[in-house]
Amino acid sequence: MTQSILQSARRIVVKVGSSLVTNEGHGLDRCALGGWAGQISRLRQMGKEVVLVSSGAVAEGMQRLGWKMRPAALYELQAAAAVGQMGLAQAYADCFSEYELQTAQILLTHDDLSSRKRYLNARSTILTLLNLGIIPVINENDTVVSDEIRFGDNDNLAALVANLIEAEVLVILTDQEGLFTGDPRKNTDARLIPEVSVSDPDIEVMAGGAGSSIGRGGMQSKVMAARRAARSGAHTVIASGRAKDVLVRLAGGEAIGTILLADMPVKVARKLWLADHLQVRGSVVLDDGASRALLSGGKSLLPIGVVEIKGEFERGEAISCLDASGREIARGLINYDARESRKIMRRPTSQIEAVLGYVDEYELIHRDNLVIL
């Protein structure tokens, strides 16, 4: 399975973490960057389109600023990112030029993808760059994001980019060999899992743990990224970036690391955008009947099926739909703000006008603006 997937893939997103592009967090490792450029150039020769999601800006900024410890304050991280992003972009441009390839720097925030228009613009830009034979180098725009609107880590960002451009494979390179049955640093009996389905409930337990002090993403974030990428049909490979020529060998069909197979229904474009690219502003708790109607009946969400409103939100913003146990089962764009929603919840649609004095929509969330997770 691994061999056919990697060999047949024509569009790949490659994510390299901080530990693979820096000298243990002390500035960029130019030799490592040159190695990635060389491998990606060989993938291009194989006829594959490659988008690179690279960490390293904050680590490079810390080095240039003389900071030994990763700062906790957001404004200090943003300052380090601003300083380091210049060096990261130039270093990649220099490395890829050795192989007569041009690079393009793309910095994204969650807001860029939460707007349908900007989402499509970002997609068009990246696809145009690929058509021109240019290597897009993508990172989160750490200089301007706040905690509330950040992607979380570059594993998540890479998965969203895979969704955005409909890549067939997401390759997440890390300092670990792949997904194990347990933490190999603590359990000597832990075994590498060569292949697993993203829907396997056991993989979250196996992932456990956190990342290094250099970056933000641990194995658990990589598993969640794989599940997100699977929504657009992309398979994910988690492998060691320390393995010699790992990208070339993967593209040649060699089984390295763990492949997480996408076995989930592929979301259509608008539903995918609703599921992954909107910042959730609140949530509604549904009764059992409403949950069943959404999950099996393909129905819109009506006020009568809502038992609780959580958070504050405006009309048209994205909210989560939770079942009685608190599990998120759907996500959508709500037709009424939080104050209005609280007034009409548990009521039939025939009473909306009497309660509010007007009717904008008879549904709390129309099924066209609703995606099941």
UniProtKB/Swiss-Prot annotation:
SMART domains: PUA. It is found in: Cytoplasm. It catalyses: L-glutamate + ATP = L-glutamyl 5-phosphate + ADP. It holds the Pfam family PUA. It is an enzyme of class 2 (transferase). One of its GO terms (cellular component) is cytosol. SUPFAM superfamilies: Carbamate kinase-like, PUA domain-like. Residues 281-359 form the PUA domain. PANTHER family: GLUTAMATE 5-KINASE (PTHR43654), ISOPENTENYL PHOSPHATE KINASE (PTHR43654:SF1). Catalyzes the transfer of a phosphate group to glutamate to form L-glutamate 5-phosphate. Belongs to the glutamate 5-kinase family. This is Glutamate 5-kinase. The lineage of its organism: Bacteria, Pseudomonadati, Pseudomonadota, Betaproteobacteria, Nitrosomonadales.
